[in-house]
């Protein structure tokens, strides 16, 4: 078989590429996650499960092949039906059905997995669990709380239930040998990423989520500290006071020292609220306080390969980022966030620009805006304008902000959207076949000096579902090279004018072919 095309991108030189077919990866790579690959775990230590953090392969170990789908793979069930069921052949792992059947997470029935909404902490179903939580936190009902993070998410039943209540949750779980949790969540159409609370900050900015949830996550909080010491506003933690009263009391004391107020508790749900009053932090700034205040050497918003530290970052008082100062959902989507009040004009222009662009996209891709497209990624956004323009569609959007560009991810969360830091010179923290649509706007123009186009496009192919779409908006310098490599990945692409019909950039609307491995 011919060797894959090699493209060296130069910002001022048009790459010349001939279409060459990429080979298929071996079938045992059908769920390959390059930066969280269990095959490479033995190279890293077990301290605080650091081997489950991101460890990307060097360039000489990168795969230059197409990841095959499982034998019998079908197009995913469409939303909202997918919230309750998925095709077994798309995620053919029986272990969770066999090992967790008594917890009612999911069950296999014929050719499908069904999701009844159960779990270890949901004996009466996740709906009753969230009803109790809403009784404890009334702000979950009125649009005050819009974004949440769920650590150790299982099959994301909590996040799925919250979608019906207007709350958008990022479900987080590590890659494990069972190859299940995040993959099931995304197959259901629920936002999720691979990740673990270990030695590195999560890839989010400070003061981003409105609420954090952890259900039986089995973390010794009083030894390492809760996961919300630098970003979250609400925190729900499941406690068994009768069995662990001493640990619970220690946790309360630790959170008090971090300026969290014990807010409410009922049954096995305990809730703390993060203070928005900096007077508390002033009282803790004495030399012998624990945890101590952080110095100014590390940006609190930095979240890409930043080591966790045992210290507190004081929220910026002038910005008033507490929930009581934020507009309620959905108003907050269109209000200029306080983080960029000096750039209000630019924010409004960005919002108008993306409304025009998305209208044009829909004329070229009629599936955009209907149930065929559920899981969407905007690969290099600024303020989340593309996602905001799709807010009334059945889709949710993972907004990606470059770890090497303008740090605007906090603005995206202030709007009530979700996103993540990422560097596209590396693989994304997700399983193969997890997104229906990938959108990029000038990514290769921005990153041509760092990232090899071939590897970026192969990563796009890995995470795009068969028969999924890509909208690629790029400079004419790169558009033909992208089209040539896409042909070698078995994509069908068509070139179009932009909404302005300008010649300096073009659109590629691509669709990935559904194919099966010859070895299966």
Locations of regions flagged by a protein language model:
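A short SAM/SAH-binding and catalytic strip from SAM-dependent methyltransferases
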Residues: 198-200, 209-225, 435-451, 470
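Conserved beta-strand signature within the Rossmann-like core of class I S-adenosyl-L-methionine
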Residues: 231-235, 242, 466-475
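S-adenosyl-L-methionine
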Residues: 182-206, 410-432
